[in-house]
Amino acid sequence: MAGRELSHLQQLEAESIQIIREVAAEFDNPVMLYSIGKDSSVMLHLARKAFYPGKIPFPLLHVDTGWKFKEMIAFRDAQAKKFGFELLAHINPEGLAQGINPFDHGSAKHTDIMKTQGLKQALNQYGFDAAFGGARRDEEKSRAKERVYSFRDRHHRWDPKNQRPELWRTYNGAVNKGESIRVFPLSNWTELDIWQYIYQENIELVPLYFAAKRQVVERGGQLIMADDERMKLAEGEQFKEELVRFRTLGCYPLTAAMHSEADSLEKIIEEMLLTRSSERQGRLIDSDQSASMEQKKRQGYF
């Protein structure tokens, strides 16, 4: 009897699970980066499947900046309690003491100190030699050329010209002392794949992904939602209630909402089939300087 042919999503799922299992077996101290977004939620679901009925054999790490949406933090804590995984939350203590924030210090400095340097601190503190990330190649041009096994030097820096070939699904995980890798099990997924898989597997998400009436201010052509009293308004700016949702999530002053009526998974998938805009157009950190994402990744960013 001929074997049943796998669907597109089943093939992606099988590939990702194989990568997760291989890294868990090959490396001494792996960790999964958990940003609380939709891609992280899918990656967490895949990790749970990979080791079911056992528990995930490595911790999840959230690099907090102090500026995440309140709904994201509540969702993070609820997921950890529900599934019983080990959750590590790290915030850069020096940046916190200096009061680094996106309003007074700008997006580039805030991202470097609170996210990039914060991540490197946590990786060094716990001695992780492999870190799973939820990046996909269709997101952004610098990520399009990144390998599944993305090698980093002892300072966690990425050199795109010094990476290893990956033939078919054969990965070389040998690293020298002090070096590490970032692993991207979702590399071959698209944004639409992610949403269809979320629908198929009934994966829980932060409610911010779904359209609702929210208080936003228009700034530079982008809609920014006020999540707490720290939100600073420029002269002439005022809040207005709009029906919006978030296509991607990050620090709330640096993440723009979009007009949308998609308040269900079915409507979001329909919206994805029709959209022609970039998923990351709402991430202000991607446009704070030329070739911004690649520069950040070279310095140790996700």
UniProtKB/Swiss-Prot annotation:
Top-level taxon of origin: Bacteria
Keywords, ordered alphabetically: ATP-binding, Nucleotide-binding, Nucleotidyltransferase, Transferase
EC number of this enzyme: 2.7.7.4
Record field: catalytic activity: sulfate + ATP + H(+) = adenosine 5'-phosphosulfate + diphosphate
Pfam families referenced in this protein's UniProt entry, alphabetically: PAPS_reduct
Chain spans, region Disordered: 280-302
GO molecular function: ATP binding; sulfate adenylyltransferase (ATP) activity
Entry annotated with the keyword Nucleotide-binding: yes
Main enzyme class: transferase
HAMAP family cross-referenced by the UniProt entry: Sulf_adenylyltr_sub2
Family designation: Belongs to the PAPS reductase family. CysD subfamily.
Function noted in UniProt: With CysN forms the ATP sulfurylase (ATPS) that catalyzes the adenylation of sulfate producing adenosine 5'-phosphosulfate (APS) and diphosphate, the first enzymatic step in sulfur assimilation pathway. APS synthesis involves the formation of a high-energy phosphoric-sulfuric acid anhydride bond driven by GTP hydrolysis by CysN coupled to ATP hydrolysis by CysD.
Subunit: Heterodimer composed of CysD, the smaller subunit, and CysN.
Listed name of the protein: Sulfate adenylyltransferase subunit 2
The organism of origin for this protein: Shewanella baltica (strain OS185)
